[in-house]
Structures are given as C-alpha cells and as structure tokens.
C-alpha cells in the first residue's frame, strides 16, 4: 500500500483534482440518501390514508414527493458524471506524469543497466504497472468513493433509529478486511511471479519483432517461440492455484456477509411487526441497508484491483 500512496504523492500537483473529486462525491452521496427519506414519507402517507379514509386526500403530497425524487436523482446523475469527468482527466494526468518520469529515469540510468535488461521487458513493465495503477484510481474515484461516503452517513442514520443495526453493518467492513488480509499476502506472491513471466514474455516478443532480421538470420524462430510460449504457460499454471485461493476465500467472505444480513433483516422485520418502526421507516432502512451492501459486494473487485495496482506500483518504483 505504501508504494500506491507514493504514486499519489508523486502526482501531488493534482491536488485541485483530488479536492474537486472529493467535494462532488460528497454531494452525490448526500443526494443518494435523499431518496430513502422521500420513499419513507410517501409510504407512510399512503399507508395512513389506506388505514383511515377520513384523512385528507394526500394526492398532491404524493405528487410533490415524486417530483422531489426525480429532482434528487436527476441532480445526482449530473454530479455523478461531473465526478466521472474529473476522475477521467485526473487519471490521464497521472498517467502522463508517471510515464514521463519513468522515461526520464530510464534516460538517466547508466549504460550498464541496459546490459542486463531486455528492452521489451522494461516497456512491458511500464505499460502494465501504470495501467493497473490508473485503472484502480479511476474506479475508486468514479464509483467507490461516493459509496464509502454514503456508508458513513448510513451508519449514523441507522444508529439514530436502532443502534444494533449499526453494529451489524459496521461489522461487515472489519470482517471483510480481515478475511481479505488473509487472502492478500499469498495472492501477491502469485501475482509477482505471474507478472515476471508476462514481462519477460512480452519483452522477448518486442525484442524479436524489433530485430526480426537478426532472429531469422540465426534461425532462432522456433527457439524464441518456445521461450515465449513457456512464459505464458507458466502464467496459466500460476493462475490455477491463485484463482482457487482467491475464490475460495471470496466464498467465505460472501457467506459471512449473508449471515450478518440475515440478522439485519430479522431485526427490521420483527421491529416493524411489533410497531417500533413504521412501514415507511422499514422501507427506508431496507433501502439504506441495500445501499450499504453494494460497496461490500464490490469490495472483492476493488481489493482485486487494488492488489494489482499495489503490485504494479511496486514494479514501477523498482527501476
């Protein structure tokens, strides 16, 4: 993780983008939380009218609530795309900074460094490491950051209604993090070995294509093809235990999360049944719990992307 933070610090000139993305993401998260409250009001209004026909006609109230829902969701959609635009430009700038600095560092290295390196491997390492880092940052800023902010707000809101709900929701993240930590160390070992084979294979490919006349003059086509194929065969052999380990642990994470949500739904249903929550409040809380579940279900993918980014950033600074 330190190497990934080092990448962010190395692009510190982009701090206006960092601030803008955080600010817009905060607004998106806030607007996303408006919808459950409006649905609560609409549900309770309709239930009250159905239960007591003598109440005033709530049609106008329901219509205005629907208009408010549209306004909140439309504004959130606009801001989400503004945040996406800022994130895309920021990532392009980070790619520019990292690529330029990598090239400048290579130009400053002495000739003896290149005597022990395959040129294509250097190029492959640059492409892979920067691609992994920028893809993770782009996904985090465009999708995961607003969700995390929403989760914090949801924990505060559920604590107001019934604190055991907050405890169960809050348990999801340390549990997921702990199980991921058990997975990550072994996964990184596999990934490092796999990246080395990919870099070496792509490096040989670039070298052979760049000097194809020399390759043919020595009749080395078959030998080079065998070397290239061997590296990618190795990646298949490494991927099998790596993927088996990752998905077995991901299954464990998923079952643990489902058990926690079983407790959450039992609390919501039973407390509504006994009159502690109105039907509207139950609908609101279910929607908020579902919103909190989304970043948790995405966490496997985020962690996978983060691990690739960490491995890539580590390779980036090894030159």
What are the language-model segments listed below?
Residues 13, 17-30, 142-193, 264-277, ...:
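Transmembrane helices of ABC transporter permease
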Residues 18-82, 159-164, 275-279:
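Transmembrane helix-loop-helix hairpins at lipid-water interfaces of multipass membrane proteins
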Residues 17-22, 62-69, 117, 135-136, ...:
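Hydrophobic alpha-helix/TM-entry signal in multi-pass membrane transporters
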Residues 220, 244, 292-319:
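Cytosolic ends of transmembrane helices, especially the final helix of ABC transmembrane type-1 domains
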């Amino acid at each position: 993780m330190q190497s990934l933070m080092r990448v962010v610090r190395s692009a510190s000139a982009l701090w206006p983008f960092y601030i803008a993305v955080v600010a817009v993401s905060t607004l998106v998260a806030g607007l996303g939380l408006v919808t459950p409250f409006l649905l609560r009001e609409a549900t309770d209004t309709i239930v009250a009218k159905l239960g007591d026909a003598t109440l005033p006609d709530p049609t106008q109230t329901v219509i205005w609530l629907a208009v408010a829902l549209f306004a909140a969701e439309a504004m959130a959609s606009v801001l989400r795309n503004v945040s996406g635009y800022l994130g895309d430009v920021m990532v392009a700038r980070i790619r520019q900074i990292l690529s330029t600095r990598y090239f400048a560092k290579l130009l400053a290295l002495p000739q003896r460094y290149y005597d022990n390196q395959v040129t294509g491997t250097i190029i492959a390492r640059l492409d892979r490491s920067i691609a992994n880092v920028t893809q993770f940052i782009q996904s985090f800023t465009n999708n995961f950051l607003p969700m995390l902010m929403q989760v914090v707000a949801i924990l505060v809101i559920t604590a107001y209604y019934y604190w055991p709900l907050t405890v169960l929701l809050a348990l999801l993240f340390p549990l997921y993090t702990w199980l991921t930590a058990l997975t990550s160390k072994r996964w990184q070992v596999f990934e490092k070995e796999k990246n080395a084979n990919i870099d070496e294979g792509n490096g040989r490919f670039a070298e052979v294509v760049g000097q194809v006349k020399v390759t043919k003059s020595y009749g080395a086509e078959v030998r080079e093809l065998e070397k290239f194929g061997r590296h990618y065969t190795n990646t298949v052999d490494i991927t099998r235990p790596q993927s088996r380990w990752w998905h077995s642990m991901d299954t464990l994470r998923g079952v643990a999360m489902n058990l926690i949500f079983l407790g959450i739904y039992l609390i919501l249903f039973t407390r509504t049944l006994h009159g502690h929550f109105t039907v509207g409040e139950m609908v609101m809380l279910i929607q908020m719990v579902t919103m909190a579940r989304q970043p948790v279900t995405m966490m496997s993918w985020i962690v996978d992307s983060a691990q690739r980014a960490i491995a890539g950033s580590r390779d980036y600074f090894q030159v």
